[in-house]
Amino acid sequence: MVGAHPWVYAASLPGYDITPVLDRIFADLSYAGVDGVELMDTALRHADVVPRVRDLSRRYNLPVIGASYQAPMWNRERHTEIMEDARAVIGRIAEVGGHTLGTSVGDARRTKIAAELDAQAEMLRKLTGICAENGVVLNLHNHIYEVRDDEYDLRGTLARIPDAKLGPDIDWLVGAKVEPVSFVHRYGGRIVYAHLRDRKADGVWSEAMGEGVIDYAAIGRALRETNFSGTLAIELAHPEGFKPTRPLRESFKLSREYVRRVMGY
């Protein structure tokens, strides 16, 4: 399955809340030819969103894959709050037919100490249990902070949760100077999800996939070599101040065609 994540819509909205533009998101991504939609936790915090998402999913014949999630899991003082929030989000993922939760563990803006990595792992284990109760699989999403400094944060998590599933963001790996093909080969058996985005040689995000320099042909080969059978999600992003040259739906369509042609998915 090749789906899409709506970050590029959320980026300009208050609180990154995609709820006001859900109709546009489903319409655009249906037009683009993707196989499903990965929602964001911001939408699923609204108790009344479930019937609306179900209706949109039926109307556009576009399944909900799951949702992305982020919380400061390293901060033990926030654990009760995170548990309550995540339980509601995960429950709604299941209600709208989703089956994945791609979570980020939170950036401490510094190197986390061992006790914080312990707290982070404890929270992840609890969330994994809630996911399992709802038929949802948790995967670890990454930004730069999880994989910089020789993957310190990620390795700290995996040392504590050896069977954790991964959902790497390929572009953020490149941003952290982690070679994506090597990452796929090293962690292939754990990878159940991946976010796809492209960047130019100067590090600036490209408008659509195929307009940058990331070697997605090699990444596609690496995924096949490691028997990847999970989900890929196109997650476009624009640099600050960027003025799109085409409608977002066209960039998603170009990206979907690129993934099929170049990656073989």
What are these regions (language model features)?
Residues 1-96, 132, 136, 165, ...:
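N-terminal pre-domain/capping segments
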Residues 36-37, 67, 126-213, 220:
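Acidic/histidine-rich catalytic cores of soluble enzymes
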Residues 22-26, 50-54, 86-90, 121-128, ...:
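Generic structural signal for well-ordered alpha-helices
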Residues 59-60, 75-166, 173-175, 249:
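Active-site acidic/histidine proton-transfer and metal-coordination neighborhood
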Residues 13-18, 39-50, 72-82, 108-112, ...:
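Acidic-and-aromatic substrate-binding clefts and catalytic sites of carbohydrate-active enzymes
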Residues 233-244, 248:
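A short, acidic, flexible beta-alpha connecting loop/helix-capping segment that sits on the rim
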